[in-house]
């Protein structure tokens, strides 16, 4: 038995193949959009504390948020503090110039002038972070209320 395929059969097969490729590509693009990591930063100083203090300390936070697992990977550098770090926290929800409770303690042993770690956020914490309602605060014995502070903002 001889089977022949007409031009219409090849056209239909080609269209089905094209549709499958496009569907797979769209699905991959949707997955990329929902798991795209978000970069954050903060510039810390004593003038951002509430109330302001005269600290000469400075700091910088860099963080990456992964929405697929709500994980925040952060790196904190600082210098010029009045003494060793006694504690550091993410606070929120709050905008610049407003104090807020601790949202997430940075439970790390701060050695030298920097630290790096990662934390998993709750849905509410992630929403506050993404909305720019978090700040990071570094405490020392001389300034236990906070020596340097910086608002956490998206790094464009």
Residue ranges and their predicted role:
Residues 1-24:
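Sec-dependent bacterial lipoprotein signal peptides
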Residues 2, 22, 26-88, 92-156:
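Metal-centered catalytic cores of metalloenzymes
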């Amino acid at each position: 038995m001889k089977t022949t395929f007409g031009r219409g059969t090849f056209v239909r097969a080609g269209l089905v193949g094209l549709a499958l490729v496009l569907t797979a590509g769209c699905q991959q693009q949707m997955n990329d959009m929902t798991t795209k990591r978000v970069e954050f930063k903060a510039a810390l100083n004593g003038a951002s504390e509430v109330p302001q203090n005269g600290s000469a300390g400075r700091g910088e936070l860099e963080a990456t948020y992964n929405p697929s697992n709500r994980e925040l990977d952060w790196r904190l550098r600082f210098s010029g503090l009045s003494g060793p770090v006694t504690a550091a926290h993410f606070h929120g929800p709050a905008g610049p110039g407003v104090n807020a409770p601790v949202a997430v303690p940075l439970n790390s042993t701060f050695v030298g002038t920097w630290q790096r770690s990662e934390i998993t956020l709750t849905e509410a914490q992630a929403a506050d972070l993404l909305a720019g309602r978090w700040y990071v605060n570094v405490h020392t014995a001389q300034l236990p209320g906070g020596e340097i502070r910086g608002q956490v903002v998206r790094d464009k």
